[in-house]
């Protein structure tokens, strides 16, 4: 994270900055560097009341990605030990790597800073795959999530036509 990123984010009232782990060899040196960079980023961001988000990405779509599952993200969060380091819980990536979305959401809700979604397989719109999003959205609401939900998917049709899922999900 650039030193000025948190200043820029604060100037537009942005509350979160998503940082990527990158494609690395899964070495101890890479892990130590990642954690040290997160300590630096969280310290700079905390001066502006900003949260740093880390996102596990599945290894099928992103081979070699350093942070590839929720357990590793939790270990990283614990090691860095900063209150403004949270997890971007991407339902698509978690489903591909580990599944059991609702259990993981319930268990780790205080660690989560943002929830993203797309369906499996293929990172498609929410009404076109194996995840029952109307049910999951209702469950997310019932467990007390007060943050944003972000759609990040690759539409099978035009963007406008792909938004039909909203009527059935809200």
Give the location of each predicted region.
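Active-site acidic/histidine proton-transfer and metal-coordination neighborhood
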Residues: 4-86, 96
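Histidine-acidic metal/acid-base catalytic patches
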Residues: 13, 51, 67-89, 93-170
């Amino acid at each position: 994270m650039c030193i000025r990123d948190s200043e820029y984010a604060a100037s537009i009232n942005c509350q979160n900055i998503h940082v990527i782990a990158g494609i690395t060899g899964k070495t101890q040196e890479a892990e130590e560097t990642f954690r040290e960079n997160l300590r630096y980023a969280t310290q700079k961001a905390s001066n502006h009341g900003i949260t740093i988000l880390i996102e596990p990405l599945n290894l099928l779509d992103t081979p070699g990605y350093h942070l590839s599952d929720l357990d590793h993200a939790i270990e990283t969060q614990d090691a860095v030990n900063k209150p403004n380091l949270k997890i971007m819980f991407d339902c698509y990536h978690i489903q591909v790597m580990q599944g059991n979305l609702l259990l993981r959401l319930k268990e780790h809700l205080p660690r989560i800073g943002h929830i993203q979604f797309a369906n499996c397989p293929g990172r498609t719109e929410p009404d076109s795959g194996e995840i029952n999003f109307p049910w999951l959205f209702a469950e997310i609401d019932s467990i007390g999530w007060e943050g944003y939900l972000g759609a990040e998917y690759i539409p099978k049709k035009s963007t406008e036509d792909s938004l039909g899922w909203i009527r059935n999900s809200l």
